[in-house]
C-alpha cells in the first residue's frame, strides 16, 4: 500500500474529528470531515468552502487525488461539490478545502466534524501530443454525443 504524507493543520483532527479512514476493506474513498468551529447553514443554491484541517503531499507524479461527493448527501439532501470533482495534483501541499454546494430545495446545516466528501487516489498518465494530419479509421469515427444509442 502506498503511503501519502498527511499534515494535521487543526489540532482537533485525530481527537475531536477522526482522521480519514477507509470504512471497509473494499472502500475506495476516504471520508473527509468539515473542520468547522460552528455549524454552517447552506441555503438552496448557496456554496461555501469548508476546511478539512488537513494538508496532503502525494509527491509521486504518477498519482493524484480526487475529491468526490458522498452519495447519501447528494441523493438525500442535494449536497454536492461546487466544482463537481476536485483534483489534487501530486505537488500540491496546501490545506484540503471542500467546495460544497446545496443544489437542493431546502437549507442544509453542515455540522463541525460531519463527513462532507470523499477522497480517492488515482493513477496519472501525462500525455505528450503527436501532431498528425489524419487518424487511422475506426468504426466510430467522429460520432459524438449519443452516437452509440441508448440500448
Curated annotation (Swiss-Prot):
UniProt keyword list: Hydrolase, Magnesium, Metal-binding, Nucleotide metabolism
CDD domains in UniProt: trimeric_dUTPase (cd07557)
Cysteine disulfide partners in this protein: none
Cofactor field: Mg(2+)
Any one GO MF annotation of this record: magnesium ion binding
Name of a matching Pfam family: dUTPase
Official protein name in the record: Deoxyuridine 5'-triphosphate nucleotidohydrolase
Species in which this protein is naturally found: Shigella sonnei (strain Ss046)
Organism ancestry: Bacteria, Pseudomonadati, Pseudomonadota, Gammaproteobacteria, Enterobacterales
Amino acid at each position: 500500500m502506498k503511503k501519502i504524507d498527511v499534515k494535521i493543520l487543526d489540532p482537533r483532527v485525530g481527537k475531536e474529528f477522526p482522521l480519514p479512514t477507509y470504512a471497509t476493506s473494499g472502500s475506495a474513498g476516504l471520508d473527509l470531515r468539515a473542520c468547522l468551529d460552528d455549524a454552517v447553514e447552506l441555503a438552496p443554491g448557496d456554496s461555501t468552502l469548508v476546511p478539512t484541517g488537513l494538508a496532503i503531499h502525494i509527491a509521486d507524479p504518477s498519482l493524484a487525488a480526487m475529491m468526490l461527493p458522498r452519495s447519501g448527501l447528494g441523493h438525500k439532501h442535494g449536497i454536492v461539490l461546487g466544482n463537481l470533482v476536485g483534483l489534487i495534483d501530486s505537488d500540491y501541499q496546501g490545506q484540503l478545502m471542500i467546495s460544497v454546494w446545496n443544489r437542493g430545495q431546502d437549507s442544509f446545516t453542515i455540522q463541525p466534524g460531519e463527513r462532507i466528501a470523499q477522497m480517492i487516489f488515482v493513477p496519472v498518465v501525462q500525455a505528450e501530443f503527436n501532431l498528425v494530419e489524419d487518424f487511422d479509421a475506426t468504426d466510430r469515427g467522429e460520432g459524438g454525443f449519443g452516437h452509440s444509442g441508448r440500448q
